[in-house]
Amino acid sequence: MTEEARRIVIEHAVEGTRLRESYFNGNADKVVDGARRMAVTLAKGHKLLFCGNGGSAADAQHLAAEFVNRFQMERPPLPAIALTTDTSIITAIGNDYSFDQIFEKQVQALGNEGDMLVGISTSGNSPNVVRAMHAARERGLATMGLTGRGGGEMAGLCDILFDVDHGRTALVQEVHITIGHLLCGLTDHFLFENVLALQPWLKDATNA
């Protein structure tokens, strides 16, 4: 291994560690709140929808899998759908209408009032994710966003926004999946280990 290659590894790891430490020091309460919102959504019999492009599509599928299968603890499957996986649906919409509508039309077909849409976009401006957010709000879904660079257009469309304001997309993505893992673990915690903590929100739908 050359010294230059080793330096690249260490610098990336150090910068990523600093970013995660800084982000979670400032946003730990927001992550807990996001997980509580997810838990309330699921406890009320609703579902989670995920969408994103490229690496964010992979994150959407990753997180949906953690909910449907399990994360760390043994528990019943939880309803979550990644809108990035059905190539027939995606190519039909993209071919007949527009790539910008591939998630929007799925939200219109699958999303119901009380569900939650989680949109992932490192720019916050992916047109198909933005349109999906608009569709979700029109149908009465809660909206959560994982973004970078200030949140972009998604900032004004999300009930709760996790914006990792950093210039390197790769590091933003690394924090996104850490946020996602924490949301999975904390949602399980609220649903199966600390159910009493959810009671105030289960009684009062306006706070969910």
From Swiss-Prot:
Keywords from the UniProt entry: Carbohydrate metabolism, Cytoplasm, Isomerase, Metal-binding, Zinc
Cofactor note: Binds 1 zinc ion per subunit.
GO terms under biological process: carbohydrate metabolic process; D-glycero-D-manno-heptose 7-phosphate biosynthetic process
Keyword Zinc: yes
InterPro entries: GmhA/DiaA, Phosphoheptose_Isoase, SIS_dom, SIS_dom_sf, SIS_GmhA/DiaA_subfam
Subcellular location as annotated: Cytoplasm
GO cellular component: cytoplasm
Domain of life according to the entry: Bacteria
Domain (SIS) ranges: 38-200
Extra remark: The reaction produces a racemic mixture of D-glycero-alpha-D-manno-heptose 7-phosphate and D-glycero-beta-D-manno-heptose 7-phosphate.
Family indicated by similarity: Belongs to the SIS family. GmhA subfamily.
Protein name: Phosphoheptose isomerase
Naturally occurring in which organism (per UniProt): Nitratidesulfovibrio vulgaris (strain ATCC 29579 / DSM 644 / CCUG 34227 / NCIMB 8303 / VKM B-1760 / Hildenborough)
